[in-house]
Amino acid sequence: MKTMNYIKIGIASSILSIAAGCTSFLEEDLKSSLAPDNTYTSSLGFEVGATGLYAIARSEYNTWGENGAFMHNGACAYEVLQISTDLCRMGTVRDGSLVPFAEMTLNPSTLFVGSYWNWAYNLIASANELLIYSEKNDNWDYPTDKQLYQAEARFFRAYAYRTLVYLYGDVPWVETIQKPFLLSFSRDPKIEVQGNIIKDLEFAKTYLPDNPDNVKEGKLTTWAARHLLSEMYLLRGAEGDYKLAEENAQDVIDCPYYSLMKSRFGNAK
């Protein structure tokens, strides 16, 4: 009988010890997958996040849907913005994705409308996430890393909103991570969104590097931000904006790292 009691006590003790360890056992310790909480903890993690922004931005030109691109069987923004103007016209081979823009028959069911909206807000959400976590992190390789990655993120957020205001006019300006998930956004006036775009680009202009030889190939420099700033000041057209557009454009023209093309290239040179 005593033996049976000892067994029961042993079983009960085991159950209690298992129950006590359940909490720690169930805590997630991610070792083989990336999430913001275990990625944005160092300069290397922010480099990973910034690389993702470049990938999303470049997917804009993957117009035929390869590898899960956001654009599906459609034209890029530059084509649709020009096709109904005197800059270009559709050839004898009619691109179905351009027809609604060329003939002014665009409607909410046009695939391009949803795909470009999704592309832009995916880039914006990813940039916002990097920016928010950069304010929480204090583990940087160099004191300038925080502002550098913030500059890249703010450039891409501005770039996405630039496309949105061209295509849709008034759009929701979002700079937070929505928790809980939110669908009921309100559109902000285009003039306000343009002001926010300019603020982002002014920040990027200040903290992006100026020498392209000191960054990895394809990485942003201050000159990209200045080029886009010139365009955005022209687009907004408020008092003093044309002068600022000229100044930023002149900075790019005069910079020692780039030059205007002065001769033809290829077979027609």
Where are these regions (language model features)?
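Short coil/turn linking the two alpha-helices of tandem helical-hairpin repeats
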Residues: 165-166, 172, 235-239
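Membrane-proximal, proline-rich intrinsically disordered regions
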Residues: 22-74, 263, 268
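Short linear capping/connector segments at secondary-structure termini
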Residues: 32-35, 105-106, 175-182
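Conserved, well-structured interaction surfaces
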Residues: 47, 55-65, 89-168, 184, ...
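Short, surface-exposed recognition loops and adjoining beta-strand edges that mediate ligand/DNA contacts
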Residues: 37, 63-88, 208-224, 234-269
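Bacterial Sec-dependent N-terminal signal peptides
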Residues: 1-31
